[in-house]
C-alpha cells in the first residue's frame, strides 16, 4: 500500500493509510467487520483482538501483556478480571485505558474524502498501543459489543 492512500474497507469506512508497517490492524479491520455482522445474530457476543504491538507494549508494560476494553467490556470489568486472574496464575496483565483523545487522534482532518487515519500524524510513542485499539473500534463501530484488545510482546 503506497503511503497516504485512501482505501475503502468492508465496514464502509474510508481510511487514509500513512504507514504500511502497521499492516496488522488493516488486516484485522475486515475480520472485525465480518465478526460484527455475525455478532448481530448472537446472544451476548464477546470479541477479542490480539496484536503484538511490540514496541509500544514494551515501552508501556515491559514484559507484561496489556489489555484494553471498550465501554461494554469495562462495564463487565473484563480487563480487570483478566488482570486479577493473571495474578493468581503468575501471568500478569496490565490494564490500559482507551481514552477519548485516541479517537480524535485518528480522525482524518485533511478534508479530501478520508474519514480516519490508519496512523496519526507525527509520532505517538507515548500511547502507541491505545490509538490502534480506538482505530479498530471506530472503524468497525464495535462500541455496542464487548471488545477486548490485548497487546502482547
Model-predicted regions and their roles:
Residues 1-153:
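A generic structural signal for tightly packed, nonpolar segments enriched in small/aliphatic residues
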Amino acid at each position: 500500500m503506497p503511503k497516504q492512500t485512501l482505501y475503502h474497507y468492508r465496514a464502509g469506512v474510508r481510511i487514509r493509510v500513512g504507514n504500511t508497517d502497521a499492516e496488522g490492524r488493516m488486516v484485522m479491520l475486515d475480520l472485525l467487520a465480518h465478526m460484527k455482522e455475525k455478532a448481530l445474530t448472537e446472544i451476548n457476543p464477546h470479541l477479542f483482538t490480539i496484536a503484538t504491538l511490540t514496541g509500544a507494549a514494551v515501552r508501556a508494560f515491559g514484559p507484561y501483556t496489556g489489555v484494553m476494553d471498550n465501554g461494554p467490556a469495562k462495564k463487565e470489568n473484563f480487563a480487570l478480571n483478566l488482570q486479577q486472574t493473571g495474578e493468581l496464575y503468575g501471568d500478569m496483565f496490565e490494564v490500559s485505558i482507551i481514552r477519548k483523545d485516541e479517537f480524535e487522534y485518528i480522525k482524518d482532518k485533511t478534508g479530501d474524502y478520508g474519514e480516519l487515519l490508519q496512523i496519526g500524524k507525527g509520532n505517538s510513542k507515548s500511547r502507541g498501543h491505545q490509538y490502534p485499539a480506538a482505530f479498530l473500534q471506530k472503524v468497525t463501530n464495535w462500541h455496542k459489543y464487548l471488545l477486548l484488545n490485548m497487546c502482547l510482546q
